[in-house]
Amino acid sequence: IFAGIILDKMGVRFTAILSGAVMLIGATINWYAVTEAFMGSGLEAWFNNNLNYIPGFDELGISPFYLGMPASAKFAAVGFMIFGCGVEMAGITVSRGIVKWFKGREMALAMGSEMALARLGVATCMIFSPVFARLGGVIDVSRSVAFGVVLLLIALIMFIVYFFMDKKLDAQTGEAEEKDDPFKISDLGKILSSSGFWLVALLCVLYYSAIFPFQKYAVNML
């Protein structure tokens, strides 16, 4: 919701770079959490002594942390949370950018190609992560995460390139970057009262409920 508000308020260019930066920050935290440099640091001591009990969440059995959980896992979870916020922001931003660039053209083909390339990115992660982890004969997970950080750095650079390309497009067409009306709290009521919104939301819930658990546990199946 907040990503949509930022996108409507600030436009595609700003939100694209913001989402890329957020993803890179989250992934960098994730990488540092699994490196040897994190072991014995002050951050490790802090995570060992904190976040062992979260009132309310523990009673419901849905706490992301627990007593005895490794500090590296806690810090990596924080980084992954930040990364996930950037991912969702990037998802809607890319869709908005495609609508702008391919309006009146092969928009459906462009969106389909974008989704196909995104799935190839997931496949790349699955295929090459074990390869990087086993480089040199010594298994080190941090190398796989570092590979992801490098890819995200490249992605951020591409977002910056897109920023200038989109700005050049506006200059050529004589149009300003399209921004929606300022966000109002009443807009949430209109969205939540729409049956179409709930239908699409339910489809997304069902889809991701099937895909993400499978991705997580498929490794153990193999």
How would you describe each model-predicted region?
Residues 2-11:
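Helix-to-loop junctions at the C-terminal end of transmembrane segments
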Residues 142-162:
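Symmetry-related core transmembrane helices of the 12-TM Major Facilitator Superfamily/SLC fold
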Residues 21-68:
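C-terminal ends and interior cores of transmembrane alpha-helices
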Residues 108-133:
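Glycine-rich segments within core transmembrane alpha-helices of 12-TM secondary carriers
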Residues 73-117:
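Cytoplasmic helix-loop-helix junction between adjacent transmembrane helices
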Residues 42-47, 163-187:
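Flexible cytoplasmic inter-helical loops of multi-pass small-molecule transporters
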Residues 194-222:
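Extracytoplasmic gate region of multi-pass secondary transporters
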Residues 68, 72, 84-92, 123, ...:
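Small-residue-rich segments within alpha-helical transmembrane domains of MFS-like 12-TM solute carriers
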